[in-house]
Swiss-Prot record:
Protein name in UniProt: Histone deacetylase complex subunit SAP30L-B
Record has Nucleus as a keyword: yes
Motif Nuclear localization signal (NLS): where in chain: 83-88
GO biological process: negative regulation of transcription by RNA polymerase II; regulation of DNA-templated transcription
Species assigned in the record: Xenopus laevis (African clawed frog)
Region (Disordered): 82-103
Length: 181
């Protein structure tokens, strides 16, 4: 679905492509040198090749290799470049000067689906039912980037909580224990 084949997709191929883990290295040439990393289960499909050529990345396939598997590093690199370009062009036309500030990029795709759903529920984000993890992460990250934050107040509160060895979770569990007694 995202341009990378899974292990299940490759089971129908020839035996040389069926098992990417037996000593095979990444099939890509990065900046003129062959990538030495071990191959993962993501394959270098035509869609990925088209994406790389559109982004003008210095990646090419090694023609002497008999498989199309790429390492996890290059898989994540290609996905991140694709996602960054989408974000830059989709947010307010991409040329507004207010987006030029140095905002750290948070990868919410690393969170579990349940965590993303809890975030969506807490902030009452409107989405269509049945979103997959990637769509949910994109919706949440769009909202997350637009939340106004008073940095000074937030940092002061965080430092206070760290110094006092307390958190809201501790307070909730203590209050529930008091109710039980």
């Amino acid at each position: 679905m995202n341009g990378f084949s899974t292990e299940e997709d490759s089971r129908d191929g020839p035996p040389a492509q069926a098992a990417p883990f037996f000593g095979q290295t990444c099939c890509l040439i990065d900046g003129g040198e062959r990538c030495p990393r071990p191959a993962g289960n993501a394959s270098f499909s035509k869609r990925v090749q088209k994406s790389i050529s559109q982004k003008k990345l210095k990646l090419d396939i090694d023609k002497s290799v008999r498989h199309l598997y790429i390492c996890d590093f290059h898989k994540n690199y290609i996905q991140s470049v694709r996602n960054k370009r989408k974000r830059k062009t989709s947010d307010d036309g991409g040329d507004s000067p207010e987006h030029e500030t140095d905002v750290p990029e948070v990868d919410l795709f690393q969170l579990q689906v349940n965590t993303l759903r809890r975030y969506k529920r807490y902030y009452k984000l409107q989405t269509r039912p049945g979103l997959n993890k990637a769509q949910l992460a994109e919706t949440v990250s769009r909202h997350f980037r637009n939340i106004p934050v008073n940095e000074k107040e937030t940092l002061a509160y965080f430092i206070y909580m760290v110094k006092s060895n307390r958190s809201r979770l501790d307070q909730k569990s203590e209050s529930s224990k008091q109710l039980d007694a």
